[in-house]
Amino acid sequence: MTTVRIPAGWPATEEEARAVQDELRGRVILDEPGPPPGTGRVTGVDVAYDDERDVVVAAAVVLDAATLDVVAEATAVGEVSFPYVPGLLAFREIPTVLAALDALPCPPGLIVCDGYGVAHPRRFGLASHLGVLTGLPTIGVAKNPFTFSYEDPGAPRGSAAPLLAGADEVGRALRTQSGVKPVFVSVGHRVDLDHACAHTLALTPKYRIPETTRRADSLCRRALKEATA
């Protein structure tokens, strides 16, 4: 497991963090199709915290996009690098997530984040931030709609409805399993929204949550127990 320290110059205040978001947000690419769903590699990233010790563990799990078999995995443990502030959660996680990605023995391909991309109050959530820093195609698949509104999509798998900030579509509520509550998909970087939804459906053949996130969540929880034992 890779050990990470807070990088020199990392934002220490909300004002500094928002300035970084403002600087990087203009680099997000929204209109590329990204890799075809079900091809190449796709990587899930997730984190787990021990708040008493200020420890965060990140996991990156690479799957074969066609079979959803695990190809590679890596973890990293670090100090929590920013206070808990809604809208700025990426600053708590990104140094450790980047270290986990760097520790992989193969290129990650498309990255799927358990969270948000442009479906974010400042249109720059974790998936967008990670995509801009790495240059890799990224999407966000979240379990709840955050502060945004939506109409419930139809009951069948694959039904979708716009996730709205006022009149602007910032993502989609997507039904990944018939009769089960939707997930909330948004563009991160270099993958448009239609393809982000197609990737999400390809990653959810049996369960509501993408297989990438399920595997990364399980691994980071195990790694946190090991790191804090």
From Swiss-Prot:
GO terms for cellular component: cytoplasm. It catalyses: Endonucleolytic cleavage at apurinic or apyrimidinic sites to products with a 5'-phosphate. Mg(2+) binds at residues 46, 114. CDD domains: Endonuclease_V. Its EC number is 3.1.21.7. GO terms for molecular function: deoxyribonuclease V activity; magnesium ion binding; RNA endonuclease activity, producing 5'-phosphomonoesters; single-stranded RNA binding. The keyword Metal-binding applies. The record marks 84 as: Interaction with target DNA. Its main location: cytoplasm. Keywords: Cytoplasm, DNA damage, DNA repair, Endonuclease, Hydrolase, Magnesium, Metal-binding, Nuclease. Its cofactor is Mg(2+). Pfam families: Endonuclease_5 (PF04493). It is found in: Cytoplasm. InterPro entries: Endonuclease-V. It is an enzyme of class 3 (hydrolase). It comes from the Bacteria. One of its GO terms (biological process) is DNA repair. The keyword ATP-binding does not apply. Belongs to the endonuclease V family. DNA repair enzyme involved in the repair of deaminated bases. Selectively cleaves double-stranded DNA at the second phosphodiester bond 3' to a deoxyinosine leaving behind the intact lesion on the nicked DNA. PANTHER family: ENDONUCLEASE V (PTHR28511:SF1). This is Endonuclease V. It comes from Streptomyces avermitilis (strain ATCC 31267 / DSM 46492 / JCM 5070 / NBRC 14893 / NCIMB 12804 / NRRL 8165 / MA-4680). The lineage of its organism: Bacteria, Bacillati, Actinomycetota, Actinomycetes, Kitasatosporales.
